Amino acid sequence: MRCGGGARACRRACRCWLSGYAGPADGTQQPDAPEHAVAREALVDLCRRRHFFSGTPQQLSTAALLSGCHARFGPLGVELRKNLASQWWSSMVVFREQVFAVDSLHQEPGSSQPRDSAFRLVSPESIREILQDREPSKEQLVAFLENLLKTSGKLRATLLHGALEHYVNCLDLVNRKLPFGLAQIGVCFHPVSNSNQTPSSVTRVGEKTEASLVWFTPTRTSSQWLDFWLRHRLLWWRKFAMSPSNFSSADCQDELGRKGSKLYYSFPWGKEPIETLWNLGDQELLHTYPGNVSTIQGRDGRKNVVPCVLSVSGDVDLGTLAYLYDSFQLAENSFARKKSLQRKVLKLHPCLAPIKVALDVGKGPTVELRQVCQGLLNELLENGISVWPGYSETVHSSLEQLHSKYDEMSVLFSVLVTETTLENGLIQLRSRDTTMKEMMHISKLRDFLVKYLASASNV
């Protein structure tokens, strides 16, 4: 029996996948509205020039940035995302005695559920094996592919199931006492549709960095805990924002009737969900651990109960993008000769800024000044303060150009070491936020920065 139209289409899809086709690189998006197009273009241009973003203009379209199909972030963007994840970890894990860190594999066991749409990990050789038969029947193709999907692993779409697998062991860790939580940060995968896709319907894989807390609580207190985490998470996002009101929340419900809430950031093109909270009930645990219910029961006072599962999952990548939009400002440039030129600055929160201080040299003996800067750099790095070594650059720039560059890089302070420093130890310190300059003794710089960053984190 020769293969029919369905088999031929299946073969074409397999060959297209094997050839490495990934569809258009720019994604599909609606055109930017006029009211925010200029500001968006200015921000994307700044983020490209200052290496917060990485990629071509097509790869940095709104839809492409949201899809997660490209390596969106450059070195400074990666550092910003790392700082955001670190703040999340401190808030949700480090300072909470009832939350424990867990880890799970990117690959999960395959599922026999017919509607499971998770991406599968399939060897190309397995596909080529059936394609070598030039005349397979439709039934043979279907049987082969169904068996392949059942036996192959799948890429995780969420961190929830990885945390559930750790539940029983961690229940023993806390002597079965409820409530407690399991936290993890990791990469998850999702399908990205494309209206310009070929008839083979090859779907691209999008990635996102997810920050997840799975909270196990008695059912009687689950609503109170969901409200607690909602308030906590909304305040946390607003803590680092220039415009806190751009972060908002709204109730939601899934197709199974389970209630939850979503936290949104108001981008110029509209609201996007950056974090989702769900009350999943006890069914997730019962499905993960079928059989003896007593193995998953925790202690609620004197009672043994199957806990309710609360899921708090945030998109760290989208959160990073939100803070870039939130911190971007266009202000008058008092140093510009043309009034039409505006000062562009990223006023990222001090805890999130990728670089805290930049070191540059002014007039004076170059070798000696660079030695001073090198010693200062080592001292600051030892105290966990990120530094930009501007003094090592070979291209000369004016102070005005340097300040403009550092404002766009969101550098909190710039330090100028001159011949005056060699004479009496005084350096010039400029603030990103106020643009004010002051003289400070070099021996006081470290303590000043440490106290400044500590106070910023406690606000």
From Swiss-Prot:
The residue stretches assigned to a coiled coil in this entry are none
Write down the Gene3D superfamilies for this protein, in alphabetical order.
Anticodon-binding domain (3.40.50.800), Bira Bifunctional Protein, Domain 2 (3.30.930.10)
Q: Where in the cell is it found?
A: Mitochondrion; Mitochondrion matrix, Mitochondrion nucleoid
InterPro entries, per the entry: aa-tRNA-synth_II/BPL/LPL, Anticodon-bd, Anticodon-bd_dom_sf, Gly-tRNA_synthase/POLG2, GlyRS-like_core, POLG2_C
Q: What is one process in the GO biological process aspect for this record?
A: DNA replication
User: SUPFAM superfamilies in the record, alphabetically?
Assistant: Class II aaRS ABD-related, Class II aaRS and biotin synthetases
One CC-aspect GO term? mitochondrial nucleoid
Keyword tags = DNA replication, DNA-binding, Mitochondrion, Mitochondrion nucleoid, Transit peptide
Oligomeric and partner information: Heterotrimer composed of a catalytic subunit and a homodimer of accessory subunits (POLG:POLG2).
Q: So what does this one do?
A: Accessory subunit of DNA polymerase gamma solely responsible for replication of mitochondrial DNA (mtDNA). Acts as an allosteric regulator of the holoenzyme activities. Enhances the polymerase activity and the processivity of POLG by increasing its interactions with the DNA template. Suppresses POLG exonucleolytic proofreading especially toward homopolymeric templates bearing mismatched termini. Binds to single-stranded DNA.
Q: What name does the UniProt record give this protein?
A: DNA polymerase subunit gamma-2
UniProt organism field: Mus musculus (Mouse)
Q: What is the lineage of its organism?
A: Eukaryota, Metazoa, Chordata, Craniata, Vertebrata
